[in-house]
Amino acid sequence: IKEGGYKCGWKNEQNMHFYSFTEGKFGYPTMIELFSRKPGYHLEIEEGIIPIHIDDDTSSLSAILLNDDFYKFMMSGRRVVDGIGVLGAEHLIPFKMYAWINLLDRKRAGEHVNEKDLKKHKYDVFRLLQIVTTGIKVESEGLVTECIHRYIEEISAVDESEIRLLQMGMPFDRDRGVELLKEIYL
């Protein structure tokens, strides 16, 4: 992260997020996010972000805390490139699905959510879908599979006029995008 010259931490609503690193030097990945497996003991936190103490200079680092199903899914899609663990688009998509569903549920429960984040995660699924290798099949289980099914159900219920994929320059409309998701994950 230091070598790549990344900026760390971004603000969303009231909270700073120190698990996402962006704007690295040319030749480095566009973004780095830190993930951690849920520990086998109770944590006194409500949300899925856990602080990580490294040293006194890095007191605000955090990681996205994953349940066992998402951790196993992430590890099953992990590839090492130049000594760095990375995920392909096909394994990132279910994380974006989960993020959208989570925000949608919070909004429906009356909680304030950032509409830009809600829209971003919805479209990130389709943006990433464009770069998934044709014909690939991805296996999942548990909560990951539930999220995939739920995303497909929810996004299929949204009026297609509200999902302007072709106008955004994507090579498919919502219905074709949903078909591709089913071919990959179901």
Stretches with model-predicted labels:
Residues I1-L186:
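Compositionally biased terminal segments of proteins
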